[in-house]
Structures are given as structure tokens and as C-alpha cells.
Design a protein with these regions (language model features):
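Catalytic strand-loop segment that frames the active site of acyl-thioester-processing enzymes
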Residues: 1-61
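HotDog/MaoC-like acyl-thioester-processing domains
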Residues: 1-15, 20, 92, 96-114
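Hydrophobic beta-strand-centered segment that forms part of the acyl-chain substrate-binding groove
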Residues: 52-111
Length: 114
């Protein structure tokens, strides 16, 4: 079994080491709960009839909901990671309809400091 990149010391990391997370299936309850928590009741997420006529043809998860779940799927050792300082280059490549199972794949990109 490969150890998660976030749990290894820098000198034990191998370039390109990959880890794939467990899955998380997006449910209707997830969309409703996220809408209630954030106040984002856009009909693409909340209105079945409206979403059926949209370019996606159905309700889809909020991008930030998917991103939040993706972060929760990361294999992070709480003794090593103290805080999230930022996220670079987040791109939402395709819609995530209800019933979709998401997974996160992480890999090591080693950039030694000067």
C-alpha cells in the first residue's frame, strides 16, 4: 500500500507517487443541505423542472460543494497539516449530477527550494 503523500516526510516522497481516495456519492440531501447552509438556491441546484430545461438537463451539485467534499477526501494526517493556505488552479471540468461518485487523486510534484 502506498502511503499518502501528505503523511510522508519530504525526503521519503517519490516524484509522481499517486494516491486515489475512497468514493463519495453526491445525494439530493447534499444539495438541499448545502443550499440551506450557504443560501445558494440557484434553480440549477434546487429546482427539478428548471434544471430539466437547462443545458445540463438535470440538477447538478454546486461547484463549491464538490470542492468541499474533495478536500474532505484528501488523505491528510492531522498531525502534519495545520491549515489550508490556498488552492491553485481549481477548474470545474464537468457537471456533477445527483448520484455521481467522486474521488480525489493526489500525486507528488517535488519542487525543492533554492
Amino acid at each position: 500500500m502506498i502511503e499518502a503523500p501528505f503523511s510522508l516526510d519530504f525526503d521519503r516522497l517519490e516524484q509522481g507517487a499517486r494516491v486515489r481516495s475512497r468514493g463519495r456519492t453526491i445525494t439530493e440531501s447534499d444539495l438541499v443541505s448545502f443550499s440551506a447552509l450557504t443560501g445558494d438556491w440557484h434553480p440549477q441546484h434546487a429546482d427539478v423542472a428548471w434544471a430539466a430545461e437547462s443545458s445540463f438537463g438535470e440538477r447538478i451539485a454546486h461547484g463549491m460543494l464538490v470542492l468541499s467534499y474533495a478536500l474532505g477526501l484528501l488523505p491528510i494526517d492531522p498531525d502534519r497539516v495545520v491549515a489550508l493556505r490556498g488552492i491553485r488552479n481549481v477548474v470545474f471540468k464537468r457537471p456533477v449530477p445527483i448520484g455521481t461518485t467522486i474521488r480525489v487523486e493526489t500525486w507528488s510534484l517535488l519542487e525543492p527550494s533554492a
